[in-house]
Amino acid sequence: MELRKLLPIFIIALVLMKTFLASAQDNIVTLAPLEVNAMRTNTQEKKLPSSVTIITREDIERTQASTVAEILQGALGVDVVETGGFGHLTSVFMRAAESNGVLATIDGVRANWGSAGQFDFGFIPTDNIERIEIIRGSQSTLWGSDAMAGVINIVTRKGKGLPTHSISMEAGSYDTYKESIHSSGTIKNYDYSFGVSRFDTEGFSTYSSWRGATERDAYDNTSLAFKLGRDIGSKKRLDFVGNWTQGNLNYDNATSDDTDFANDSHVHVALPFKMAVNERWDIKLTPSFAYRDSDTYIPGNYRNVDKSTTVDLQNNLYVTDDISLIFGGEYREQKAISYNSYTGSIENWSQYLTANYDYQNSESEYKNFLLTAGYRHDYHDHWGNHVTYKFGGGYYLPKTNTRFHTSYATAFISPTLDDLYSSSSNPNVTPETSKSFEFGLKQNLSERSNLNMTFFNDSRKDMIALDGNWIPQNSEKVYSRGLETELKLGLPKHFNLALSHTWNEHYDQDNRPLIRRAKNKIKATLTHTWEKKLDSLVGLYIRGRATDISSLKHTGGFTTVRAAFKYKYSNNLKLTLRAENLLDEEYEVVYANGTPGISGYAGFTYTFN
């Protein structure tokens, strides 16, 4: 879709804005400032010199998304690519970087696999998630490898107040059933959150039905999440965080069943300990462990096991009211066992330092000038030393309620264990590197309305790609630039409209676009709340044309429409109803891979103390 075709949409939106904003003031709701943990400190979103999106628990419940991948689809600057139906590998691209350039963390614990370097966002259900933080742009000075394009931090729910319990059930198309139980609260000196969920579906074919596929690929998923914490006095806190998920998927032929299958198990465990040394110095020690066991038969047994052990020691030092430091060190060991190919491991030691200067104008109640500088040194036992740095700044204009932000950063992605140790490995392959720049603004239009725009430009070199013999080589250069635009409007009568557009132009050294990444993506969401009882949502998602299979094939652009409703029948009972792909669009995100047609789901949530 060409940009000129989008111009009328933005013109109409801006004209309507002036009409609606004044009358919308009657519905003002003051919200608490949102904080972002993925920046290694509880920094308010409005102060960050980065492009950030926070998806809250309220957003998740309103959309009724079942997985993290579903809630991420259409998010600003994010491209979600599913390789088939329920349970198939789901990759996430940001700013045209490969999926191993997007770091996934669960409660601040790294979740990317050591073997392939990426994370499957379609594997994690949303039942026990409190919020999702999307930080676009390089974050390597804080997180090292895998954060070249950004970080997606999944924060699980934390208990508070009187123990509350809930039971949820949903059923719908493709013989799909979902059940979940959740309990959270505070008992004596402990706060806890516990959730378990089950998902079963007969699904649809991995191969596109409109290309002739008739069979169905069944899938089931069981997930358990647990968080237990205690404040030790007034200055210490200890938490235990555990997440376990197992999925079973049938791989079938296009027209008949067979015995192919894939079983995946994921475990993430962390034991963060926080201590306030004094009023200006906090310490956080986080040992964590991640495990993945993937067993595939298509035919023949292909089993892969990933293990990752990390110990992170972080210090937050508030030197003055205006100057703060984040510094520490991290040790990480990754192991992979491919039972038909290799066994390998790598170790990484790192030290990091980020300094923030938040200037207070004596003539203003606002801190309207922020400077930040970051440095990180990584030592990898296979390829040696690597240094990354980042400079950023933000400026706030109180008179116009406008905030500007900009940053320049370097980043890298380590070769994966597959690159270094598999049967077609290359022990001489080195890290991919990048340099990136971004500039953006956030204009508050009213209490419920704002406009966000960020321009970015990235250049990457030594990109790892397979040569003609399927051997990984540092051979490619990649260029990416784009504009991320989001407009949120608080309309009269409790309506809210959110419009977003991501334009991302990308190409390699031969001027070819990168595969499976659309140049244009548009999302529009209209929500309404009626007498605090009925929440309604109608969403439109447009994805442009994309290349596939080494630029030899293409997937066409498509438009999908969805709707979701939640009715508060009583203080204890909520009824839900949603419909997906209301236009029954026949489309593909990956060439020849199936996607769901028109479908509907209904359910309920019962809450009690």
How should these model regions be labeled?
Residues 24-61, 99:
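Short, acidic, small-residue-rich periplasmic hinge/interaction motif at the N-terminus
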Residues 141, 153, 160-162, 170, ...:
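Periplasmic-side early beta-strands and strand-to-turn transitions of outer-membrane beta-barrels
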Residues 109-136:
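Short acidic/polar hinge/loop motifs at secondary-structure boundaries
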Residues 359-365, 455-459, 474-550, 568, ...:
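Gram-negative outer-membrane beta-barrel transporters
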Residues 69-109, 113, 130:
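Extracytoplasmic beta-strand/coil segments of soluble accessory domains associated
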Residues 233, 278, 320-324, 334-336, ...:
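Structural signature of Gram-negative outer-membrane beta-barrels, strongest in the C-terminal barrel
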Residues 256-276, 304, 403, 407-491, ...:
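Outer-membrane beta-barrel signature, preferentially recognizing the C-terminal barrel domain
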Residues 68-71, 88-93, 120-125, 134, ...:
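N-terminal periplasmic accessory domains that precede
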